[in-house]
């Protein structure tokens, strides 16, 4: 992608679980450090699946990160001489992260955010959705559906091997034991209400 010349912008890397979001974030961070740029990496403290102080991709690549409980802590620990701020699993942050990211970009920082763009229901995931609208650059990655082999853009939550209910909590930190990528047609959510108006869904 062609980069803008003025300093400070937002990049969003999004997609389903196992689509390579953290891997792509790590790749961009490493590329920047090779170029002698100062990078700070942040992650939500709730995400301790593989490491408490590293961003770790599902294939084992890793980069050191600062775990924070809330979005404003990113600003509190941000160094003004930092060129790039990278934020992994951005969907786990409170909505203050939107203002934090915007502030950093306005103050000359290249901000790289990686996160799920849809929740397990297949619905837009905040704050990723808003950040995608604000971003100068959006990269949407896809995994492979293990059921049919098609490109997978959704995340299937499994509870004891069965599809989760629509009414389950949105946030449940997990990996392959609880989630797998699915295409639109193989993605299943029990008790999911229709999004059509009643007149349309009843065929009238």
Swiss-Prot record:
It is an enzyme of class 2 (transferase). Homotetramer. NCBIfam families: PRK04296.1-1. The gene is tdk. PROSITE patterns: TK_CELLULAR_TYPE. One of its GO terms (biological process) is thymidine metabolic process. This is Thymidine kinase. Its EC number is 2.7.1.21.
